[in-house]
Amino acid sequence: QGRLEVMATLALAAPAKCAYELERAVDLFGARSALLPATAGGRPLDGPEFDGLFAVAEKLGLLLFMHPVSAESPTRFPLYGVQVLVQWPFETTLAVTRMIFEGVFDRHPGLQLLLAHGGGNLIFLKGRLNSAYEATGWEADPYYRKHVSKAPGEYYKQIFFDTCSLSPESVGFTIEVAGADRVMFGTDYPFDIGDPEAKRALPALNRLEENARIEEVHDEVLELFMDL
């Protein structure tokens, strides 16, 4: 077997057809994973119309790689690349937070996501999301328990986070919160603000037991992407 495998691209405008096309990509082309935008043209992914797609991914054991493609008008963020620097990680954060509280991971306990850009702010918001679920008294909001069976942070066990948060400190904290087995090396290539030579990620990764980390990453990639 070679080093390259097929990743399907999901066009979410027609969710039912998208689920069919995902199965077809597996049957015809041997896809092992699929690229998932953070929204369907601005529409959240937590609605029941997307359950068929997630059910197919769950049934076939496919990893869904969520990478935002902004539906916002660039005129709102005209300078400094703010759309890429800030809005994309925020879109991922919002998308997955909604998926958690709307019960997507409860309905699909075998669903596995890989999040670009270190998962946006999800790692840093874990305690805040949990506190909303655990709140009592006047702060308690029934919505935070309506569709979930456990604290939001528990669903992070269905999520992989890449190392493209782009600082040793943030990568290190991601490993601390999510666990080394839920962190996957990424470069964000070919974007200019990525980490193609791992200069930002390696200082954090090197703090781990090197041989154990190499073995974990190796096994993760082979299992998730290459079916070995």
Q: What residues fall within each predicted segment?
A:
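Conserved catalytic cysteine-centered active-site region
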Residues: 2-5, 32
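Short glycine-enriched loops at secondary-structure junctions
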Residues: 12, 68-72, 189-191
